[in-house]
Swiss-Prot record:
Catalytic residues, chain numbering: 95
Family according to the record: Belongs to the SelU family.
UniProt source species: Cupriavidus necator (strain ATCC 17699 / DSM 428 / KCTC 22496 / NCIMB 10442 / H16 / Stanier 337)
Subunit structure: Monomer.
Protein name: tRNA 2-selenouridine synthase
Purpose: Involved in the post-transcriptional modification of the uridine at the wobble position (U34) of tRNA(Lys), tRNA(Glu) and tRNA(Gln). Catalyzes the conversion of 2-thiouridine (S2U-RNA) to 2-selenouridine (Se2U-RNA). Acts in a two-step process involving geranylation of 2-thiouridine (S2U) to S-geranyl-2-thiouridine (geS2U) and subsequent selenation of the latter derivative to 2-selenouridine (Se2U) in the tRNA chain.
EC number: 2.9.1.3
GO MF annotations, alphabetized: transferase activity, transferring alkyl or aryl (other than methyl) groups; tRNA 2-selenouridine synthase activity
Keywords (A to Z) from UniProt: Selenium, Transferase
One GO BP: tRNA wobble uridine modification
Catalytic activity line of the entry: 5-methylaminomethyl-2-thiouridine(34) in tRNA + selenophosphate + (2E)-geranyl diphosphate + H2O + H(+) = 5-methylaminomethyl-2-selenouridine(34) in tRNA + (2E)-thiogeraniol + phosphate + diphosphate; 5-methylaminomethyl-2-thiouridine(34) in tRNA + (2E)-geranyl diphosphate = 5-methylaminomethyl-S-(2E)-geranyl-thiouridine(34) in tRNA + diphosphate; 5-methylaminomethyl-S-(2E)-geranyl-thiouridine(34) in tRNA + selenophosphate + H(+) = 5-methylaminomethyl-2-(Se-phospho)selenouridine(34) in tRNA + (2E)-thiogeraniol; 5-methylaminomethyl-2-(Se-phospho)selenouridine(34) in tRNA + H2O = 5-methylaminomethyl-2-selenouridine(34) in tRNA + phosphate
Keyword Acetylation included in the entry's annotation: no
Length: 367
């Protein structure tokens, strides 16, 4: 049998399969990318055992757990774990602290003829390791921050620079009032875990510096780790420039055509389009206090006309109308002010090709 492991770095770098035997509620609160939840106890069973532990102590709780998970229920769970182990012979199992639950699953699997190692310290220890990884990277790594006006193509540049970490991708949100995607954002802890693993892999690859997009503290409702936010605010800024027309077309591609495609893929043509249209209207309403009544009314009318044309004929031309007004009168003045505040941090500026070349050169792998 392979030994149990506490080598968290290798676990996350290798991306081996992990079997999470915590209760579903625990898993939903925070998990690791790709981990599979096959619990020893479901939420109701865990609740009963927890009450018993509080009232009668550990031994009584253990006995109750064996009573609740017995017979056909126990056999079905062992079968599911064994199937996972056979499908992922290089994987590991874990519970919250690497204690009784994972040990019991290991014992039951062994009795069924399957030896499978567990992670020493469990979820809690791995989570702590990832928090330390983010903290250390924020303190010790060199970082560049990519800024630019709305629609300048920052996400496109990130995709072209191997040393880049896509915060918005991990948060599943484009980082503005119109940034919500068709799928919900991941839980906060899932976001932090996935981000830390990505950071770990980039550091292991030996990049001289790491690149992130200029973000505030929040991306949608996800909170960027404070240590990283503070480091970003003090890091050199690279400014991406693009013409107004290019930016309009990029916003049209991402926030209209791309968003519509996401919703339709998720919900089907009719329901998906309705959900997409609702999402755009909600986003516009969300910034109405800052737009003012008259401008909000104008933009809402333009948006409604564009959505009607898109629904009827599949055309998106009219969307350029509200996009142009929103960029020129709302986003550009806001970003211009922010750029003035950060001017001293800008170390390079240019179009997509120039910025991409500069960033590749300044983040290249060591050696």
């Amino acid at each position: 049998m392979r030994p149990d492991t506490a080598d968290f770095r290798t676990l996350f770098l290798s991306g081996v399969a992990m079997l999470d035997v915590r209760a579903p509620l625990e898993f939903a609160r925070g998990a690791f990318p790709g981990a599979v939840n096959l619990p020893l106890m479901d939420d109701a069973e865990r609740h009963e055992v927890g009450l018993c532990y509080a009232q009668k102590g550990q031994q009584a709780a253990i006995e109750l757990g064996h009573q609740l998970v017995s017979g056909l229920r126990k056999a079905a769970r062992i079968a599911a774990w064994a199937e996972f182990a056979r499908a992922h012979p290089d994987g590991y199992l874990y519970c919250f602290r690497g204690g009784l639950r994972s040990q019991l699953v290991q014992q039951w699997l062994h009795a069924a003829g399957v030896d499978y190692p567990r992670v020493t310290g469990g979820y809690k220890a791995m989570r702590g390791f990832l928090i330390e990884t983010t903290d250390a990277a924020a303190a010790e790594q060199q970082w560049f921050v990519l800024g630019g006006l709305t629609g300048s193509g920052k996400t496109d540049v990130l995709a072209d620079v191997p040393a880049a970490i896509d915060l918005e991708g991990h948060a599943r949100h484009r980082g503005s009032a119109f940034g919500r995607r068709a799928l919900a954002q991941p839980p906060q802890i899932d976001f932090e875990n996935a981000l830390a693993i990505d950071v770990l892999r980039h550091i292991d690859a030996g990049w001289r510096a790491l690149l992130v997009e200029d973000e505030g503290r929040f991306i949608g409702s996800r909170d960027v780790p404070q240590v990283l936010t503070q480091r970003m605010q003090a890091s050199p800024l690279v400014w991406l420039e693009a013409s107004f027309d290019e930016r309009v077309e990029r916003v049209l591609r991402d926030y209209v055509q791309g968003l519509a495609a996401e919703f339709i893929a998720e919900k089907g043509s009719t329901e998906g389009f309705e959900a997409y249209a609702t999402r755009l209207r909600e986003a516009m309403a969300g910034i109405s206090p800052r737009l003012g009544g008259a401008r909000y009314g104008k933009l809402s009318a333009l948006l409604d006309q564009a959505l009607a044309q898109q629904a009827e004929r599949g055309e998106v031309d009219l969307h350029r109308g509200w996009i142009e007004v929103l960029l020129r009168e709302y986003y550009d003045p806001m970003y211009a002010f922010q750029r003035e505040q950060r001017e001293a941090r800008i170390v390079f500026r240019g179009d997509r090709a120039a910025v991409t070349d500069w960033l590749r050169a300044h983040t290249a792998q060591r050696g």
